[in-house]
């Protein structure tokens, strides 16, 4: 949401795997409304730690562009990778939009909100409810 309370239209997303930081500049030039740094399904389990480190580095150096929303799609909170993702971003103190996939209950959203609130960090959440 924009600061004035109006909703921002989003027409397109482009996902960039955290394992491929060299693709970020192409993603920003794509014309997409949202550039999503992918830590979830687009990253193999053996590459999760390196992808997370890459994304933290990218967030610290990403170009500012008010017309593009930068989002990080983390792993589900119901596995170790998701918890590790959140801990990494809690430690950065960067403004952040988190895409939370595979949400099964409101408790998952509350946990994230509470963690970042306790750390005095503002985040935006994009909650994805998925079914099989």
Go through each PLM region and give its residues:
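Short, Gly/Pro- and small/polar-rich lid/capping loops
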Residues: 1
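Conserved alpha/beta-domain cores
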Residues: 4-132
């Amino acid at each position: 949401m924009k600061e004035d309370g109006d909703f921002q239209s989003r027409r397109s997303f482009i996902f960039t795997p955290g394992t491929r930081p060299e693709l970020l500049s192409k993603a920003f030039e794509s014309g997409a409304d949202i550039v999503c740094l992918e830590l979830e399904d687009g990253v193999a389990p053996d590459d999760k730690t390196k992808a997370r480190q890459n994304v933290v580095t990218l967030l610290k150096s990403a170009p500012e562009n008010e017309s593009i929303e930068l989002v990080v799609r983390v792993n589900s909170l119901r596995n170790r990778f998701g918890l590790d993702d959140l801990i990494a971003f809690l430690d950065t103190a960067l403004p952040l939009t988190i895409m939370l996939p595979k949400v099964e209950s409101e408790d998952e959203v509350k946990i994230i909100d509470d963690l970042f609130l306790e750390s005095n960090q503002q985040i935006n959440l994009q909650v994805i409810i998925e079914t099989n």
